[in-house]
Amino acid sequence: MTGFLRVFLALSATLSGSWVTLTATAGLSSVAEHEDALLRHLFQGYQKCVRPVLNSSDIIKVYFGLKISQLVDVDEKNQLMTTNVWLKQEWTDQKLRWNPEDYGGINSIKVPSESLWLPDIVLFENADGRFEGSLMTKAIVKSSGTVSWTPPASYKSSCTMDVTFFPFDKQNCSMKFGSWTYDGTMVDLILINENVDRKDFFDNGEWEILNAKGMKGNRREGFYSYPFVTYSFVLRRLPLFYTLFLIIPCLGLSFLTVLVFYLPSDEGEKLSLSTSVLVSLTVFLLVIEEIIPSSSKVIPLIGEYLLFIMIFVTLSIIVTVFVINVHHRSSSTYHPMAPWVKRLFLEKLPRWLCMKDPRDRFSFPDGTESKGTVRGKFPGKKKQTPTSDGERVLVAFLEKASESIRYISRHVKKEHFISQVVQDWKFVAQVLDRIFLWLFLTASVLGSVLIFIPALKMWIHRFH
C-alpha cells in the first residue's frame, strides 16, 4: 500500500509540473502573439517620413534633455571639445496609440528607432561630420502614443578657446541642438531640465565642469522661427601638471640666471650658464607652442612669462659680457680709471652693498724720492771736496748705488701701480656683479608675481 502511494504522489507531481509549464508557455506565447499583433496594427500603413499629427497645424512638442557621461578631451590646438552624451527626447506620436485591454494589457513596447518618425535633433556646432546620435538604439512607445528615445552620442563640438590665463584658464564651450528640417510651426523644443544630468559623469583628469546649463532660444529666418536649445559648459583646467612640469622649471631657470652674477668674473662659465638657460627656455617655448592654439589675438600667460624670462636672460648675457670686459681692464689696455669711478665704485657703493675691499692699499707720498746725491744725505754738515783719490772713488760708487736704488724704487712703484689698477678694475667688476645680482633678483621676483598673481587670484576665486 505504501509503494502504491509513493507512485501515485510521484505521478501527481509530474502531471502538476507539466501543467504549470504548459500554462507558462501558453502565457508567454499569448504575450508574444499580442505584441506581434500590436506591432502589425501600429505599423500597418505607418509612414515614418510623415509627421505623426492629426491636423497639419498641430505642433509636435519634443521634450529635450542632455545627460553627459564623459568629457573625453578638450583640444586647445584644434579648438574642439569631445564629449560622450545621452540625448533624452520625448514626444507624442498620434499614430502609435492603442487600448491596452485589446492587446493583453500591454502598456509599452520597444521599437527600433529607424522604424519611427524622428524629430531629427542634431548638434549644429559639429566638427567631425556626425550630427546625429546613434540610431542603433530602440525607443519606448507607450499606449498613450508617448515615444521616449535616449540615444547615446559621441560629439566633437567646436569651441572658441581663450588661453589668456593658460594654464589657469577657464573655457566656456556650448552645444547647440535643434531640428534640422522642421521650423517652430511643426516641431517645438521644450527643456526637460535646464541643468545637464551629471549623475553618471566620469571625471576628467585635466578639466572639471563648474557649471552646465541649458537655455532655449529661437532663430528667425524671414517668416520662420527655428527653436533650439543651447547647453553651456563652464570648464576649468586643473593646473597641477603644468605647474609641476612647466612653471616651476621656468621659475628655476629664471633664478639660475640671477646666480650668473654670483659666479666670479674670472671664471669662464658665466656666459655658458646664461646661454644654456636661454636654450632651455627656447625648448619650453616650443613645447607650449604645440599645446596652445596659434592665435595673434592673445598671448597666453605662460608665454608672456617665458618671453619675459628670455628677455631677462638676454639682458643678463649682455651685462655679463660688459662685466667681464670691466674685469679684464688695466692701464696696459689703455683704460685708466676716472676719479669719479674710484669714488663711486671703490668708496660709496661697496659700503651700500655691504662689501669689503680685501686688498691692502699702499700709498706713496709724492716727493718722497730724493733727487740729491750721496753728498746731500748729510744735512748739517758742510759740503766738502774729496781730497784724495780713494774718497773720490768711494763717492762715485755710492752715487751709482743710490741711482740703482732709485731705479729699483721707481720700477717697484710702477709695478705696484699697475697691480693696483688691475685690482681696482676687478673690484669694480665685483661691485657691478653685486648690483646686477640684486637688480635681476628683484626684477625676477616682481615679474613672476605681477604675471602670475592675477591669474592665481582669479583661479582661486572661481574655485570658491
Swiss-Prot record:
Disulfide bonds join C159-C173. Activated by a myriad of ligands such as acetylcholine, cytisine, nicotine, choline and epibatidine. It is found in: Synaptic cell membrane; Cell membrane. The gene is Chrnb3. This is Neuronal acetylcholine receptor subunit beta-3. InterPro entries: Neur_chan_lig-bd (IPR006202), Neur_chan_lig-bd_sf (IPR036734), Neur_channel (IPR006201), Neuro-gated_channel_TM_sf (IPR036719), Neuro_actylchol_rec (IPR038050), Neurotrans-gated_channel_TM (IPR006029), Neurotransmitter_ion_chnl_CS (IPR018000), Nicotinic_acetylcholine_rcpt (IPR002394). The keyword Disulfide bond applies. Glycans are attached at N55, N172. It comes from Mus musculus. One of its GO terms (biological process) is presynaptic modulation of chemical synaptic transmission. Coiled coil: none annotated. The keyword Ion transport applies. Belongs to the ligand-gated ion channel (TC 1.A.9) family. Acetylcholine receptor (TC 1.A.9.1) subfamily. Beta-3/CHRNB3 sub-subfamily. Component of neuronal acetylcholine receptors (nAChRs) that function as pentameric, ligand-gated cation channels with high calcium permeability among other activities. nAChRs are excitatory neurotrasnmitter receptors formed by a collection of nAChR subunits known to mediate synaptic transmission in the nervous system and the neuromuscular junction. Each nAchR subunit confers differential attributes to channel properties, including activation, deactivation and desensitization kinetics, pH sensitivity, cation permeability, and binding to allosteric modulators. Residues 31-238 are extracellular.
